[in-house]
Amino acid sequence: MGQKVHPTGIRLGISKPWTSTWYANTADYADNLFNDHQVRQYLTKALKTASLSKIVIERPAKSIRVTIHTARPGVVIGKKGEDVEKLRKHVSKLAGVPAQINIAEVRKPELDGQLVADSIASQLERRVMFRRAMKRAVQNAMRIGAKGIKVQVSGRLGGAEIARAEWYREGRVPLHTFRADIDYATSEANTTYGIIGVKVWIFKGEVLGGLPLTQEQPAQPKKKGRSPKREG
């Protein structure tokens, strides 16, 4: 059976950036890595209703800078910035250094893999038919401008006795092309029948030199015929 490599892992350093950008010596590396995990775990739990896309962590000179990418920045900030201040204090306590929190808004949540996967998972938990949830996500992504999208759900679909996987795809999702900008994400739906896994691949276009390519113009065909004779 053919196995698939993680679409983000294989593109790191080619067309995908790391979500933790810092350098540490051997003694501090493990502590920093575990610390990043704790910060992400806390923020994901605290901002469960804020439509989190990703959390980027930087560590400039004995401090920590956390950028929260979310579709609902108002929920993160809170009334007069009270909520974000609570988050900053807790992150600073976890990291043991001064913390700074930045918030980046996700303009098109329909094209964000993590937000699409979480949306499908929440629909499944609300007992929406899985085929309807998948089709709606695919149609919305294609309408907003995705070049292709694939959605897969697996588990006891519809309360069936035997677990299975079903997928739906529109457009093209070239997993073998390194320059393809593919946003891959997973999520889980906790239903009464057990956990249903959700996987989403969104193809947004091709990246060259770190920037998405615009639509290539077709080459103009050369005109046939004799070249004009020179006089003289």
Curated annotation (Swiss-Prot):
Residues of the KH type-2 domain: 39-107
CDD domains reported in the protein's UniProt record: KH-II_30S_S3
GO BP annotations, alphabetical order: translation
GO molecular function annotation: mRNA binding; rRNA binding; structural constituent of ribosome
Stored InterPro entries: KH_dom (IPR004087), KH_dom-like_a/b (IPR015946), KH_dom_type_2 (IPR004044), KH_sf_prok-type (IPR009019), Ribosomal_S3_C_sf (IPR036419), Ribosomal_uS3_bac-typ (IPR005704), Ribosomal_uS3_C (IPR001351), Ribosomal_uS3_CS (IPR018280)
Keywords annotated in UniProt: Ribonucleoprotein, Ribosomal protein, RNA-binding, rRNA-binding
Function: Binds the lower part of the 30S subunit head. Binds mRNA in the 70S ribosome, positioning it for translation.
UniProt cross-references to NCBIfam families, sorted A to Z: rpsC_bact (TIGR01009)
Protein's name in the database: Small ribosomal subunit protein uS3
